[in-house]
């Protein structure tokens, strides 16, 4: 069975059939055998043109040859329903809103616009209009089926719809509106639409939103689902603003009902902020909507691009604990030219990442997570999703902090809960919010504290007996459990009366006894650098240049983005057309200068249009770099270290080997590395002992090596993150930003705190 990891593969530039085959081959070799073809900014092929469909054919044919699966995406960028502006060219197909408060009450606007930080002003499609939706399907779904119908249900598994919504034009004081809504209102409620509107009837907002919700479901969701079913594939994707219950209703109507109508319902968990106040609310929603085909989550899109594998794994298992078994990885870039358009966040599941080989291990973890998602658990409490109160207040901002606080407290106290809507289960108490946002349990008003006290479970505590936030436990009906360290500090915690050690972002499926008998390994390592170091030269805001200098005389080159001009100390550099060490997907967009010497005197590199994740200029060479951020940014370079001592940490980029001669003690069964987060491989006398992407980093030793002097080689890989330099400084100081995504940590460090023999 194929891995449940599915890359959202950004189709950018003008890839050839060979480019596509090579790209998919790279994914396949690294544990990924499902891709979603993702039309995105940076694509130079006209969307839905014959050239476009030729590229899609190349994807499908290559996937077939490699035994991979393909998912389609139903628009260009997001949100879905417009076919890259083709639908809204017809004014009758544009989303409408009606003013329900203040001046011009009752005015219907068919020319509403929504300002997008990324895409500017645009119209949005009316997904309550069946004719508009039929036109959208004819432009996209039908065109794909016309050309590739014989692959539907085999190579092609489904079509992804991204953030469709009826709320894009409904700012405060407005509601979604469709033609002849007033007729449906009269039929449904026996009252006049405009009489209730003008008299400010307390039921008007709720009633109107119910109609809009039903129309959205009938005209868009049900229609797409029916089309997909009849063509042998799945309709998947997610709705807008699904992380907050109120806004999920404001933008989509009856959120849980509409999401449940997807064949493979999904959520958008792109921030990977494991301490986010809305995370548990988001996961509870998809768990409710899950179908027999499963559920999906779009994950990791905001990065950072140097996110640890431990955090990725933890997010996969947290998703699985809420019955999610398809993991769409955002984004996999064929090349990074899309960063010219979507500039301020970057995540990459592709071979441009030096540590991409670790995806093979994450893929195996994902398969375990998928099986975990099949398990059920019994709730200690049911929580009625706040659909009604959200519908009543859909024309204004509304704060449901009390709900988020409750869900988080329950989750970290080990109290299991599930959403319900209209159901009346009897196997656990039911809690709901009244119109004043009071928590009502068994007919009585309660505080969060009193609810916790009544439902108290054995919470996970620290060694002082204090309840700990950030540790999540799921107890399944089959008697098994999962413990996840979402954001608590690494250390020992009391679980069921025993002290258990949890690493940062630990995933604990079974009780794991850590080694107690160990001995420190003392040696010095030779350092072998497998690639040149690469780091950006940042020119932020009004700055036109950056500087570089060196403690010792060094030879360096500069990478210059092909669409920019740079000068080095006032002169245009000479290019070397036969050398380019930049990673695949990046090298295509940069020229490399000929080698030159750099000394202690600063040289000035003038360049323009520097972008956060597509630098105008980078320096390349055999050096270590001290990044200096300020009004004028730069780098101070020094020789790379040739020897490494245990306990040191050092910044660099790419792949590094640490080599030493050691004598294996009698009785040693393993080697333990402490204090790293990197993808790490360990070799003993030239043979691979193992590879790890998460703690514990423990590698086995065969007894045949006892008492022998052997070569110990430790290989570590960084992410792509180090080449982008101090992006935290960029985020804090950039004057112009489209949208600040999750910042990079800028803290990739090679090395370890300790290395121990295990007995």
Q: What are these language model-derived features?
A:
Residues 3-22, 33-40, 45-85, 90-102, ...:
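Carbohydrate-binding surfaces of carbohydrate-active enzymes
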Residues 75-85, 608-633, 717-759:
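Glycine/proline-rich low-complexity spacer/linker segments in large multi-domain proteins
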Residues 82-150:
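Catalytic and substrate-binding clefts that recognize carbohydrates or anionic sugar/phosphate headgroups
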Residues 221, 226, 655-660, 671-680:
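C-terminal substrate/ligand-recognition segments
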Residues 564-566, 680-682:
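Short beta-strand elements bearing conserved aromatic residues within extracellular beta-rich modules
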Residues 583-602, 697-709:
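Short, surface-exposed tryptophan/glycine-enriched loops
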Residues 601-607, 669, 710-716:
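Extracellular beta-strand-rich recognition modules
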Residues 689-693:
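Short beta-strand segments within Ig-like beta-sandwich modules, predominantly Fibronectin type-III
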């Amino acid at each position: 069975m194929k891995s449940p990891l599915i890359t959202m593969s950004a189709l950018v530039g003008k890839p050839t059939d060979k480019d596509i085959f090579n790209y998919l081959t790279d994914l396949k070799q690294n544990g990924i055998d499902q891709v979603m073809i993702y039309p995105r900014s940076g694509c130079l092929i006209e969307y839905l043109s014959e050239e476009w469909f030729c590229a899609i054919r190349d994807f499908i044919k290559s996937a077939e040859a490699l035994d991979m699966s393909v998912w389609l995406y139903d628009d260009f960028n997001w949100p879905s329903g417009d076919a890259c502006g083709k639908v809204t060219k017809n004014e009758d197909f544009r989303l409408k809103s009606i003013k329900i408060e203040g001046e011009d009450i009752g005015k219907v606007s068919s020319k509403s616009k929504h300002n997008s930080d990324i895409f500017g002003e645009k119209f949005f499609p009316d997904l309550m209009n069946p004719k508009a939706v039929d036109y959208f399907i004819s432009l996209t779904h039908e065109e794909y089926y016309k050309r590739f119908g014989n692959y539907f249900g085999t190579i092609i598994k489904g079509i992804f719809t991204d953030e469709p919504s009826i709320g894009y034009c409904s700012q405060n004081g407005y509601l979604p509106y469709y033609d002849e809504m007033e007729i449906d209102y009269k039929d449904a409620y026996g009252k006049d639409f405009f009489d209730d509107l003008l008299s400010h009837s307390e039921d008007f907002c709720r009633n109107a939103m119910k109609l809009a919700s039903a129309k959205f479901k009938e005209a868009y969701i049900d229609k797409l689902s029916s089309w997909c079913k009849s063509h042998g594939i799945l309709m998947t994707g997610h709705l807008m603003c699904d992380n907050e219950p109120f806004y999920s209703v404001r933008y989509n109507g009856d959120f849980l009902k509409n999401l449940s109508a997807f064949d493979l319902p999904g959520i958008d968990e792109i921030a990977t902020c494991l301490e986010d106040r809305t995370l548990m609310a988001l996961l509870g929603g998809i768990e409710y909507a899950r179908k027999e085909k499963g559920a999906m989550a779009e994950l990791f899109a905001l990065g950072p691009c140097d996110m640890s594998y431990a955090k990725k794994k933890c997010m996969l298992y947290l998703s699985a604990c809420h019955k999610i078994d398809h993991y769409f990885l955002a984004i996999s870039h064929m090349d990074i030219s899309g960063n010219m358009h979507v500039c301020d966040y970057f995540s990459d599941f592709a071979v441009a990442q030096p540590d991409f080989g670790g995806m093979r291990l994450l893929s195996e973890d994902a398969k375990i997570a998928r099986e975990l998602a099949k398990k059920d658990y019994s709730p200690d409490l049911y929580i009625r999703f706040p659909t009604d109160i959200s519908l009543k207040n859909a024309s204004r901002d509304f704060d449901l902090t009390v709900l988020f606080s409750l869900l988080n407290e329950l989750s970290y106290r080990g109290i299991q809960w599930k959403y319900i809507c209209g159901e009346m289960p009897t196997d656990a108490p039911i809690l709901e919010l009244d119109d004043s946002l009071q928590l009502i349990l068994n007919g009585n008003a309660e505080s969060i504290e009193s609810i916790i006290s009544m439902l108290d479970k054995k919470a996970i505590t620290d060694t002082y007996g204090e309840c700990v936030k950030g540790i999540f436990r799921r107890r399944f009906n089959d008697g098994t459990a999962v413990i996840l360290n979402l954001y608590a500090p690494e250390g020992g915690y009391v679980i069921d009366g025993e002290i258990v050690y949890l690493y940062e972002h630990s995933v604990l499926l079974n009780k794991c006894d850590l080694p107690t008998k160990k001995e420190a390994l003392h040696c010095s390592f030779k350092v072998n650098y497998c690639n040149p170091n690469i780091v950006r030269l940042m020119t932020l805001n009004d700055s036109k240049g950056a500087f570089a200098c060196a403690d010792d005389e060094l030879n360096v080159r500069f990478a210059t983005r092909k669409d920019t001009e740079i000068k080095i100390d006032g002169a245009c550099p000479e290019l070397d057309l036969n050398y380019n060490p930049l990673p695949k997907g990046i090298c295509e967009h940069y020229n490399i200068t000929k080698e030159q010497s750099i000394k202690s005197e600063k040289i000035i590199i003038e360049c323009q249009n520097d972008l956060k994740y597509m630098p105008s200029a980078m320096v390349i060479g055999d050096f270590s770099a001290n990044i200096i951020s300020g009004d004028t940014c730069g780098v101070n370079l020094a020789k790379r270290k040739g020897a490494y001592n245990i306990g040191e940490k050092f910044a660099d980029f790419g792949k590094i080997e640490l080599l030493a001669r050691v004598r294996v003690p009698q009785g040693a069964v393993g080697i333990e590395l402490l204090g790293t987060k990197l993808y790490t491989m360990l070799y003993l006398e030239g043979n691979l002992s193992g590879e790890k992407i998460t703690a514990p980093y423990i590698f086995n030793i065969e007894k045949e090596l006892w008492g022998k002097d052997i070569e110990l080689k430790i290989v570590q890989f960084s992410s792509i993150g180090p080449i982008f330099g101090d992006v935290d400084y960029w985020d804090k100081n950039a004057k112009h930003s489209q949208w600040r995504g999750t910042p990079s940590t800028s803290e990739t460090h090679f090395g370890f705190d300790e290395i121990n023999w295990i007995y």
